[in-house]
Structure formats: structure tokens, C-alpha cells
Amino acid sequence: MKRFFTLIAGATAAASMAALLGMSAAHAAEPAKASKPDLAAGEAKATQVCAACHAADGSRGLSANPILQGQHPQYLAKQLHEFKSAARKNAVMQGMAAPLTEDDIRNVSAFYASKQAKEGFARNKDTVALGEKIYRGGIAAKAVPACAACHSPNGAGLPAQYPRLSGQHAEYTKAQLVAFRQGDRTNNAQMATIAANLSDKEINALADYIAGLR
């Protein structure tokens, strides 16, 4: 009888140990949760690394550089990772992104995303109609889809998938579409395919129209 209870106790202990080990393995298999972005740290790093080109709050600096304020943090983080890995080519940005840690990227992206995007405006009234037509309806004859389908009718984009476009510098948008078309920017195959079918006139009209979206 004593031996029976000893066996039961041993089996119970073994089962408990197995359960404990199973729980430990399950916890070990769980991915570590990303820490919450630190906006103050993001602001400090942005001031140190980014502000000279993108302004302290990511607002309307030089038109050759993108406006960052109000951009989706997932998109900003993705671009920084791709600059860092050289998946997106830009000598200046690759140098800036290279020393950034994962926390730096998360914090800086969240900081710029937390800023309220300012409204922009279209400058060329003669091309607004063409830009609007392409943005909202695409160009069926060229298999160019409507930009609004992915970037939303008001250019707000879709977090984690498509960037915000509204209010972006026309010069920057134009430069990126041309880079996609020429194969100089290769980190988005879908955009490369679309841009390949756009003429200079269509790109200019589209970029100017996007600058005034709100």
C-alpha cells in the first residue's frame, strides 16, 4: 500500500514537473512584446539626427525632403529599417539610419507620427483636373489603378500598409514616382509597376494634386 502511494506521489510530481516545463517552454516560445514608444526619447533623437533636414517637428522643411509629421509610425519605421539594410537606397539616409537602434526607430517614428499634419496646397491650377482624375480614377488604358484605392480618398493612407500622402511636398512626391519608374527606388514592387506607366506630365499633375489633398 505504501508502495502504491509512493508511485502515485511520484507520478503526480512528474506530471506537475511536465506541466511546469510545458508552461516554461510555451512562455519561452512567446515573442517578446515590443516596449511602448518613448516620445520624449524620440524627440531627443529626432532633434539630434533628423531635424536639420526634416525640421524639429517633421513639418514643412526643404521640399526635396519628405514631411514626416502625421505619417503612420509603421511606415516610418519600415523606411528606416530599409534605409538601414540598404533595401532602400539613399546615401544620406543610410548613414543616418545605420546607428539607430530598434528603440530609436520605434521612438522617432512614434514622435513624428504624434504630430498633427499641416494642410498643404496645390500650386498649378491648370493640372488639378488631371491630377484628380488619376488619383481618384486611375488610367484604365495604362492599367494604372486609382491612388485613392490604397491611399484613401483624402490621402490619409492606411496604417501599417499605405503611407499618408496628403499635404506632401509635390517635389518630393514627384521625385519618388520618378525614382520608382526609373528603377532607382526598388523597395516597393507595386509602386514600381504603377509608376512605370506614368508620363512626366501625369506625374507632375498627380504630385501637385496630392500636395493639396486634405
Give the ranges of each region predicted by the language model:
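Bacterial N-terminal signal peptides that target proteins for export
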Residues: 1-15
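C-terminal segment of classical bacterial N-terminal signal peptides
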Residues: 14-27
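Electrostatic cytochrome c docking/interface patches
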Residues: 26-46, 59-64, 114-140
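Gly/Gly-Pro-rich "capping" loops immediately C-terminal to redox-active cysteine motifs
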Residues: 39, 43, 58-85, 94-99, ...
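Conserved hydrophobic/aromatic "anchor" residues
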Residues: 46, 83, 111-112, 180, ...
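The canonical Cys-X-X-Cys-His
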Residues: 50-56, 108, 144-153, 206
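C-terminal capping alpha-helices of c-type cytochrome domains
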Residues: 98-120, 171, 194-214
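Surface-exposed interaction/gating patches
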Residues: 119, 126-161, 166
